[in-house]
Amino acid sequence: MPKLKQDDPTKQSYTVSEKSIEIGYKPAEIKPLKVKDEEPEPLPFVYLKAGFGNYLTPVIDFSITNKNTEKFKVGLQGDFISSKRKNYAFQDYLESGVKLFGQYNFKKVLIGTDVKFNFDKYNFYGYDHLLFPEELFDKDTMDISYRTIGFKSYFSNYADNSKDLKYKGHLGFNQLKLNDGRSENIIDFSVLASKKFKDIFTAGAQISGNSTSLKSPGVNNRFVVGFKPFAGVEMGIWRIEGGANVVIDEGDVFAFPYLKNQLEIVPTKLVMYNEWLGDVSVNNIFNTYTKNPWLSQNIMWDNYKTEDRRFIGLRGAITGGFSYDVSFGQMVYKNMPLFVNDTTDFRKFTFNYEEK
């Protein structure tokens, strides 16, 4: 190929002129704009319900707390109801109670204490007092009263923490005294803790116990303690939690199932669930007298077992404050106490324990 001639590039030069022009500029004055404050929602801190019915029955129910409860809450609750009938001698009743409560919110933990006093009085009913002589049934033999003094301290976390831990617990004490000389002291406690892993898995355990000491006329001391380990999985709209509830009741060991399964079909509005829960229910005067206050002094107190089997259920909440819960299942009781008239005094009841 022929050799091409290479020419040197032509030299080029440029002349750039620079000119500066000063222009005065005054920005518009910045004025702060205030957004209109929204009126805070008024929250009631005083509640009072009062009424009056036939048989000279006054009803009072009240509650009062401090107005700003963001950091702490202190309050007082009370209730009272009684009846007074002229034509039915000694067949009236009275129920009253007052509770002082307080709780304090730390950064992520809430602690609180309740102190209460209850006085309930019941007169025997269901008989015609005109058929019996006054010497047999007088005012002192036709009523029974219950006085309860108790307190409860509790704690729980109400905010998320770096370790994804949830925990809560309580310790309670109740002293019950009857006007026939019987008394009962109850101590109960529970502690629950759980941890979440990878926003899917949950593992935890709960320990709880109850100690009942009854003087009637001898001494009857009973202690129940339970331990419940559990684990769960949560994936989208489905959640399942299962474990075992192991209970020691006066030296006897019982193992119950613990299973909760739910499917959130429509968030908060339609939830399908089924459950299988078992436990030992404490049977004492404190838990029984509100169902039947006429309890014999000759009762042999014993606890009973329960199993709540919910085969299928639907629950949810609808706008407007309406909620529903419909389920199909069965309750299974073992050693269930049934009230039976005492043969020595028809005004009192003892127990017949049904095996199943």
Model-predicted regions and their roles:
Residues 48-52, 78-80, 113-121, 169-175, ...:
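Transmembrane beta-barrel strands of outer-membrane/channel proteins
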Residues 43, 48-51, 239, 243-256, ...:
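Exposed, low-structure sequence patches enriched in small/polar residues
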Residues 88-91, 123-132, 178-186, 214-222, ...:
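Outer-membrane beta-barrel translocator domains and adjoining extracellular loop/strand segments
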Residues 71-74, 108-113, 160-167, 197-205, ...:
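Repeated loop/turn-to-beta-strand initiation elements of outer-membrane beta-barrel proteins
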Residues 29-30, 39-48, 52-98:
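Outer-membrane beta-barrel translocator/receptor signature
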Residues 84-99, 114-164, 172-184:
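Flexible loop and strand-edge segments within Gram-negative outer membrane beta-barrel domains
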Residues 42-44, 56-58, 92-96, 143-151, ...:
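Residues that define the transmembrane beta-barrel architecture of outer-membrane proteins
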